[in-house]
């Protein structure tokens, strides 16, 4: 009998908790058919479900939920969300693998509306969302375009609108992506340097290997580099300011002397003309 692994259970509980946080509060979370105990052994049955009552309009972040499931898993999977009109409510069910004969919504970037009559079912997998993005020429980078489902429940019909929502501030998102890329490149360079030190352990002397490791430890992180740059700029600006303060009396005295000299010259010239 396998022992109870609290860490694995906590990881699965954390995934479900995050999904509950991003799903609309007007959707009721129901009991699932399977528990999440091991990200390496994924269940084939339903792992979560949400239902919405009649006369209700909600937004379901389908792509974000599917990517949460994909990132949590430690084995190959293609997460799938099934949407059903039960006749009294709309039901969202999550699977790590699409069930046999699972319906797939035939949507494109131009035709993104689906109407479900009573007891009818549709669904969409993460691979299907990526295919729609490529077909519509949308940006495939993270945070650029995320699919959401606008669900309008008016029994006996449920209307679904699959829409891509972009970031609120595209320039800020671009800066975040560039910053993450630059920091990732720096960390990769440092890791490669450390790995080269480790690989050279059997080639160079222990002293040289120790010095290589010490240099890597003393190397400042990108955050420290940025802070040092800002500190140096601040010190330079303060030095310039203090220098300007020191030179101010000298400049004032020089201006007064120049004014007196000009006045004397003008006075002498005026007297010469009078006489």
Curated annotation (Swiss-Prot):
Post-translational modification as stated in the protein's UniProt record: Phosphorylated.
Spans through the membrane: 252-272
One GO CC term on file: host cell nuclear inner membrane
Record organism: Equine herpesvirus 1 (strain Ab4p)
Region (Disordered) residue spans: 197-221
Tagged with keyword Membrane: yes
Superkingdom of the organism of origin: Viruses
Family, similarity comment: Belongs to the herpesviridae NEC2 protein family.
Record-given protein name: Nuclear egress protein 2
Compartments where located: Host nucleus inner membrane
Reported function: Plays an essential role in virion nuclear egress, the first step of virion release from infected cell. Within the host nucleus, NEC1 interacts with the newly formed capsid through the vertexes and directs it to the inner nuclear membrane by associating with NEC2. Induces the budding of the capsid at the inner nuclear membrane as well as its envelopment into the perinuclear space.
Perinuclear space side: 1-251
Keywords: Host membrane, Host nucleus, Late protein, Membrane, Phosphoprotein, Transmembrane, Transmembrane helix
UniProt membrane topology term: Single-pass membrane protein
Nuclear topology ranges: 273-275
One Pfam family matching this protein: Herpes_U34
Location (main, coarse): host cell
Subunit structure: Forms a heterohexameric complex with NEC1.
């Amino acid at each position: 009998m396998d022992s109870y692994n609290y860490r694995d259970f906590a990881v699965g509980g954390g995934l479900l908790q995050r999904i509950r946080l991003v799903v609309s509060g007007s959707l009721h979370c129901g009991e699932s058919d399977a528990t999440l105990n091991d990200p390496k052994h994924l269940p084939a049955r339903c792992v979560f479900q949400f239902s919405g009552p009649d006369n209700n309009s909600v937004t379901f972040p389908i792509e974000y939920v599917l990517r949460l499931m994909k990132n949590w898993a430690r084995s190959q999977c293609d997460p799938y969300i099934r949407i059903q009109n039960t006749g009294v409510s709309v039901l969202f069910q999550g699977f790590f693998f699409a069930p046999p004969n699972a319906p797939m919504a035939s949507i494109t970037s131009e035709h993104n509306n689906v109407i479900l009559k009573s007891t009818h079912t549709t669904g969409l997998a993460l691979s299907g969302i990526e295919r729609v993005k490529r077909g519509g020429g949308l940006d495939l980078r993270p945070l650029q375009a995320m699919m959401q489902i606008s669900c309008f429940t008016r029994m006996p019909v449920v209307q679904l609108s699959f829409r891509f929502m972009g970031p609120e501030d595209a320039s800020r998102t671009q800066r975040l992506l560039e910053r993450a890329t630059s920091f990732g490149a720096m960390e990769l360079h440092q890791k490669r340097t450390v790995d080269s030190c480790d690989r050279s352990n059997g080639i160079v002397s222990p002293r040289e290997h120790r010095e290589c490791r010490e240099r890597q430890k003393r190397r400042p992180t990108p955050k420290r580099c940025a802070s040092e740059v800002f500190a140096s700029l601040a010190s330079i600006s303060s030095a310039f300011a203090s220098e300007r303060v020191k030179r101010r009396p000298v400049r004032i005295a020089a201006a007064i002397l120049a004014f007196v000299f000009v006045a004397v010259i003008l006075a002498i010239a005026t007297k010469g003309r009078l006489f």
